[in-house]
From Swiss-Prot:
Disulfide bond residue pairs: none
GO biological process terms on file: glycine decarboxylation via glycine cleavage system; nucleoside metabolic process
Subunit field text: The glycine cleavage system is composed of four proteins: P, T, L and H. In this organism, the P 'protein' is a heterodimer of two subunits.
Annotated keywords: Oxidoreductase
Oxidoreductase listed as a keyword: yes
Catalytic activity: N(6)-[(R)-lipoyl]-L-lysyl-[glycine-cleavage complex H protein] + glycine + H(+) = N(6)-[(R)-S(8)-aminomethyldihydrolipoyl]-L-lysyl-[glycine-cleavage complex H protein] + CO2
Gene3D superfamilies per record: Aspartate Aminotransferase, domain 1, Type I PLP-dependent aspartate aminotransferase-like (Major domain)
Gene this chain is encoded by: gcvPA
Annotated EC: 1.4.4.2
Function: The glycine cleavage system catalyzes the degradation of glycine. The P protein binds the alpha-amino group of glycine through its pyridoxal phosphate cofactor; CO(2) is released and the remaining methylamine moiety is then transferred to the lipoamide cofactor of the H protein.
Descriptive protein name: Probable glycine dehydrogenase (decarboxylating) subunit 1
Keyword Zinc-finger among UniProt keywords: no
Matches recorded under HAMAP family: GcvPA (MF_00712)
Amino acid sequence: MRYLPLTPEDRANMLATIGAKSVDDFYTDVPDAARLKGKIAGLPDHQGELAVERHLTKLAAKNRSASSGPFFVGAGAYKHHVPATVDMIIQRSEFLTTYTPYQPEIAQGTLQTLFEFQTQVASLTAMDVANASMYDGSTSCAEAAVMAARVTRRKKIILSGGLHPHYAAATRLLAEAQGLTVVQLPVAIDGEGELAKAVDGETACVIGQSPNVFGTVTDLSAVADAAHGKGALLVSVFTEAVSLGLVTPPGEMGADIAAGEGQSIGNGLNFGGPYVGLFSCREKLVRQMPGRLCGETVDADGKRGFVLTLSTREQHIRRDKATSNICTNSGLCALAFTSHMTLLGGKGLKQLAELNHEAAIELADALGAVKGVEILTPRFFNEFAIRTPMDAEAVLAMLDEAGVVGGVRASRLFPGDHLGDVILVAATECTTADDIAAYTDALKEII
């Protein structure tokens, strides 16, 4: 329904109820010099709805969307096709809310979808149990570090040199606020070789990423063995959930906790959010797992039902005993993830992953054939790093003028790490042969 403003009689009754003579009485404590009188400078007069739509459309046309031309940006957020069915499902009135389903008697539909979400995430990561989502991948990573410290009763967190810097920053923020020590290893494009060597008897967990921020796919099994040999945990992080359709999942590499981003499945780029954090772990750690957990039970009549269980958030118990203070979370984004995963199925996810990998191989072959361009990532899924003979920022600016969004300069993520000539490039199932040709042709003209 359209907005219906208050009538003068409504306002008079409201003022009389609270004992005020006029609306100005509310602002008696605001100095007169600080009050705005008259029109706001630059604000146009009101217009009809059609005129406003035209004006906003004109403003929006100044933007370049991810679908308006060749687009090769990744670095933690990826452009994938989202079936129209997903949006149809999440816009149903029964689901269109992020509020917590505290009352199971009236929220069985929402609780069941969360249960299915957990089942899918646990299967995807090859773990025993998953929670009902986190805010995003970076908060999942941070919560995993703090959880590991609780489990091991140690205070040292080791971050790999291939961990996404935004994830590292979120982890430092949360961990250091709780008195933990965070050790960041030097930036590493190729694998996690130094991670296993860094573990000692004081380490709570090591956090590795595969594919890492440079796209390198790494077997973390040796890191898991090294961590477990010292009584520490391995946290396996991922930013591209579609990769788990092909690469070895965290659980099969010996990880104790898997934390990552689910945006790639069912969710658009959304200007950087909202996204949906994925979090799973071994069953023996479930009581220390942050966030919500939806469980299956039976009601008084013996019928299957779903409820929130093991609620150890600070809203339920004492803060010092709580496993997290995550509040109303990414439930709607989790539903989008679940809907897309259900439509894909296991075979569909594998096929989607294969399309991504094939597109990336074609892109790497094409870019690698350009004189002066070097492919730096040895083993990749759908993203890799290239080195150009020119400054990366200048190259990307000229590509932009040619209508190609060429990727993310590595120096934006790692300032001062001698990566000024490195660009992170991603390809997905949305990348066409024409897109690759446009990139290659433009790059040849530039360098």
